[in-house]
From Swiss-Prot:
Gene Ontology MF terms in the entry: DNA binding; DNA-directed RNA polymerase activity
Subunit comment: In cyanobacteria the RNAP catalytic core is composed of 2 alpha, 1 beta, 1 beta', 1 gamma and 1 omega subunit. When a sigma factor is associated with the core the holoenzyme is formed, which can initiate transcription.
Name this protein carries in UniProt: DNA-directed RNA polymerase subunit omega
Pfam families with a match to the protein in the record: RNA_pol_Rpb6
Catalytic function, reaction form: RNA(n) + a ribonucleoside 5'-triphosphate = RNA(n+1) + diphosphate
Source organism: Synechocystis sp. (strain ATCC 27184 / PCC 6803 / Kazusa)
SUPFAM superfamilies for this protein: RPB6/omega subunit-like (SSF63562)
InterPro entries per record: DNA-dir_RNA_pol_omega, Pol_omega/Rpo6/RPB6, RPB6/omega-like_sf
The entry's keywords: DNA-directed RNA polymerase, Nucleotidyltransferase, Transcription, Transferase
GO cellular component assignments: DNA-directed RNA polymerase complex
EC number(s) recorded for this UniProt protein: 2.7.7.6
Length: 76
């Protein structure tokens, strides 16, 4: 039996579209999500929050939550 995360795939798609829509450059935001996912994977290797959540999904959720802070999406 496979365990399913309690996250809805449509919700993840909505969050990623929201994140991409707010970004001025789709490539840069994609790279930033990938870097955040890589950091999450190395830092939270044995995380007890939700071990079934993939690092990329966690990064998308975190970054879409941080949309209120423009420095996350601005081109530095």
């Amino acid at each position: 039996m496979t365990k399913r995360s309690n996250l809805d795939s449509n919700h993840i798609i909505y969050r990623s579209e929201e994140l991409l829509g707010a970004a001025s450059n789709r490539y840069n935001i994609t790279v930033r999500v990938a870097k955040r996912a890589k950091e999450n994977r190395s830092e939270d290797f044995d995380s007890i929050d939700d071990p079934n959540m993939k690092p990329a999904i966690r990064a998308i959720i975190e970054m879409s939550d941080e949309l209120t802070r423009p420095e996350i999406i601005s081109d530095n």
